[in-house]
Regions:
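Glycine-rich, aromatic-flanked loop segments that form ligand/cofactor-binding clefts
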Residues: 61-91, 106-132, 153-177
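N-terminal hydrophobic targeting/anchoring segments and the immediately downstream early-domain regions
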Residues: 1-86
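Hydrophobic faces of well-ordered beta-strands that scaffold small-molecule active sites
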Residues: 12-19, 38-42, 71-79, 124-128, ...
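A charged helix-plus-loop insertion that forms the helical arch/lid used to bind
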Residues: 91-103, 146-147
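Mid-to-C-terminal alpha-helical segments outside catalytic/metal-binding sites
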Residues: 303, 308-333
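Second-shell residues forming the walls of enzyme active-site clefts
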Residues: 6, 27, 48-67, 151-310
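Short glycine/serine-rich loop/turn segments
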Residues: 93, 124-146, 171-194
Length: 333
């Protein structure tokens, strides 16, 4: 299928976008009909109730799509538990509490979360957080981490993820290669993670290795900078997005950026530059919260394909992974 996709659709199948409110914007519907987005990320204002969310997601999936792109779109949300939760329901506690309660409790929370998400129409959970929480870091302060050691994180986060998958919801390990020591939110300010290569690999990446080995579906790349690994933010770095994640950990699933239309990311360049950098690094999906920014990114990727700034072959590899995930989700639940 991917070899037959026009360049505009090949570019679009690397885009996930968000929008405000409970109505599908006409511009987003046009992109869906044209095959120019792979999915939508939903936030709390999109999902004021389960019934409102269900109506919106049905509307999202309804428009006809081009041949080869007819499997359901990726419908994503952040349902971590605790402070980060977009719909009522499970997880009923924070990741920190799940980690303290252990694997069986975490798996039960994952099963219940999958059922709640599927009822609304969400097929991708942007969870679990796999970051190893350090004292004073934003992950620890918000109780978003499953533990303060790699073993603690993996012991509960991986069963939580497996239970989500068992319920027909794809899982997303985040924020690779690790934000457990970040002192500020990466959406608000550029974060520099000054850990050694050995610490990053032996501690921070260790839960991701377990997640990958267990068949995790998606990995979200951080927009922080890790000088020991690369001078570029992780999501724009081939050393990290391809070298660490795919070559070192053997990940074969879908990779996605953290949000690219943030104040922090804008310091690295405009939408076209950032989108092209992330795609060239080997990150499969580019995440935007603003549909206007997402449309600019799609056009930038189209231009990059036409000028061979991004190779057709590498784009086809990324899009094949995305379409395989969409197809797998269409067969589950």
């Amino acid at each position: 299928v991917v070899s037959r996709l026009p360049a505009g659709q090949l570019a679009g199948q690397r885009i996930v976008l968000g929008f405000a409110g409970t109505r599908l914007p006409a511009a987003v519907e046009r992109m869906i009909r044209a095959g120019e987005i792979a999915g939508v990320v939903f936030f709390a204002d999109n999902l004021p109730s389960r019934s409102a969310g269900r109506r919106l997601i049905r509307r999202l999936q309804a428009p006809p799509r081009p041949p080869g792109l007819r499997d359901p779109l990726l419908a994503m949300t952040d349902q971590e538990g605790g402070l980060v939760k977009r719909i009522d329901g499970a997880p009923t506690v924070s990741a920190r509490t799940m980690g303290a309660r252990g694997a069986a409790f975490s798996a039960d929370q994952g099963r219940r979360a999958a059922a709640d998400l599927r009822r609304v129409g969400i097929n991708v959970d942007l969870a679990p957080v796999l970051d190893v929480a350090r004292p004073g870091g934003t992950i620890a302060d918000a109780n978003r981490g499953f533990g303060s050691t790699a073993a603690e994180v993996a012991a509960s986060a991986v069963p939580f993820a497996a239970a989500l998958q068992g319920g027909g919801v794809a899982t997303t390990g985040k924020h690779f290669p690790g934000l457990g020591s970040a002192r500020l939110n990466t959406d608000d300010a550029v974060q520099r993670i000054d850990l050694s290569k050995s610490t990053l690999r032996e501690v921070d990446e260790a839960p991701y290795r377990r997640f990958v080995e267990a068949g995790g579906d998606v990995v979200m790349l951080s927009t922080a900078v890790y000088p020991a690994l690369s001078p570029q933010p992780a999501a724009f770095s081939s050393q990290i997005a391809t070298g660490e994640l795919r070559e070192r950990l053997g990940f074969k699933g879908v990779s996605i950026t953290d949000a690219l239309d943030t104040v922090a990311v804008r310091s690295f360049g405009g939408p076209a530059k950032v989108a092209t950098a992330a795609a060239r690094a080997g990150t499969d999906l580019l995440l935007y919260t603003d549909p206007t920014e997402a449309a600019k990114a799609q056009r930038a990727l189209l231009h990059a394909l036409r000028t061979s700034t991004i190779s057709r072959a590498s784009s086809e590899e990324s899009v094949q992974r995305v379409l395989s995930l969409r197809h797998d989700l269409s067969q589950s639940g």
